[in-house]
Amino acid sequence: MKKFIGMALAAVISASSFTALAAGAIPDHQGTSMDGIEIGTAQLNSAVKSYYDLFEQAGDQYGVDPNLLAAICMQESSGRNLSYRDDGSEYPAWGIMQIENTLEKSFAKFGEDTTGEKWTLQDRLDPTKAVPFAAYLISQSLIRYDCDYIKMIQSYNFGQTVLDRIIAAKGND
């Protein structure tokens, strides 16, 4: 996990001129701690870079650094829109942001709230829908976990329910 975090944040930090990833974007944000995060040398490929306008739009709307969205996209799918994770899990993930079936209800509600139309799981393959939803999830995780970027990345990777169970069992560290 430490390698994943380092790779994801390396792409963010190497492409970003910001000193704090969400400074001012999240209510009561007190700054960003990078303690314990190793910076790697991951690069974004051309497929991920082709979605950068979407990352900027969604990032602006939800207070998430577009470079963080790009880094997560790179890690999750390498920008391959038809990417499908079939690892034997009953909850496969699809699209450039690897949105899982478990998020079906919240994805549909997000679509209805933002566009007036309930989105289906098939809509995960539409980057214009998947990227804003991912930005929304990230912004909500940053609020929920008090701007703890490690927990936000873990929440995106494992799912909020799994992370909350781990925290309940092992503590908040």
Model-derived features: positions:
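Positively charged n-region of N-terminal signal peptides that target proteins for export
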Residues: 1-4
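Cleavable N-terminal signal peptides
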Residues: 8-10, 20-22
